[in-house]
Amino acid sequence: DDPDVFRKQFEKKVTKVMKRDGYRIEELSHELLMKFTIDTLGRCVDVQYPDSLGGVRFNPTQRSRELLNTALSELNPFTPAYKDGRKIPYVRKMLINMNFLPGAFVKPTFRGKKDGLMAFREYLNRNLVYDTKLYEAGVYGTVRVEFYIEPDGTITLVGASESPHPALTEHVQKLILDTSGQWTPLLEMGHPCRYLISFPVNFDPG
């Protein structure tokens, strides 16, 4: 069977079983390795979850194993492998990233708005002040600031990778810091995670 076709069918089945059987996203592992044998009848047997691959460690939760086992058992039988005209068992190994599940990866939001970055840009546009002296001196361009949204919704500044003037950098960074605590953080598999943003702010005299 085509590996890509199988993966799509399997992901669809996993999603269906998750919804049907009431699995919660926070119970599941983000990434895991699955190994199974397709026997001569086309059934998936001897399902295993190796704990490493090329130095990468895996620690799948019990609920993740249960979900994948159920989904695998409900797939249509495979076409068995053949060698010299005879059916033979075939071992398949798959690295599974659960990002395809609903709610597996939820981007940060600002002040409860669905489009967090758009709401953040609107906030900046309302509060930006273009210093008159800099404007008259022809200082313009893009201030690009990097910052983290922490798991608790606070802000940690990294710095500015681009800026036409330190005063503009300071102004933008202050506005960003003022939003600390007003963010809902990135959620991966239901768990709050640190998230890096590189955000451009344009100062245009025209």
Language-model region placement:
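Charge-biased low-complexity segments
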Residues: 1-206
